[in-house]
Amino acid sequence: AQARLLALAFPLPATTLPVAASVGHYLVEDVVAKRTQPAADLSAMDGYAIQFADMPGPWRVIGESAAGRQFDGQLSTSRAVRIFTGAHVPAGADSILIQEEAGRHSDTLTLTGAGPPGAGAHIRRKGTDFSEGDRLLEAGMRLTAGPIGAAIMAGFGELRVGGRPKVSIIGSGDELLSPGEPCDAAHIPSSNNIMLAAMLDGLPCDTVDQGIVADNLDDLENAFSSCA
């Protein structure tokens, strides 16, 4: 009987939803990155962008780079740029001197600690997370918080997901009574309808409680017909 029922199942038409509305749905196509993340070399620490070859300094601070507000100039020898976590690393810089190991007086920067261990220190390289064209999510995946975040970072504002099936729940039996009704020894409370609806809660489907149907073929046929 189960095999016959499953053989009648078919995929519902796909739909396009905003990413915020697609939570809990299932992807119908792969998510392929439209952008690279990070899109540029970024600082992993607060501090100063420098050229490692200039160690141990001193340097002259010539500007500032913050997230969303980058330094557009070129860093040259013995120069430094104040930088914050997530900011673009200026052209010409190859290391970050963290602020805990630096001293600054006006525009003069000096080394007060060990300094970066080598060129490339404290820099998140372009494409560390993923590159444009990478397949990040596979069709058939259920969209939870993590995949939703990945899709957004990959450049998606909408996603193609499966349609929402309608699930009708029927409680059948002459012995069933609605929850809370007084029960004698010949009857029991009908718990399955509400229990099954609770189990389906959170899945991408619409549930309809069709109530209790007596053990009568005509009534059952009518109930099933009303679900179509």
Each language-model region and where it sits:
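Short, glycine/charged-enriched hinge/interface segments at domain edges or termini
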Residues: 49-209
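Short beta->alpha junction loops
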Residues: 209-217
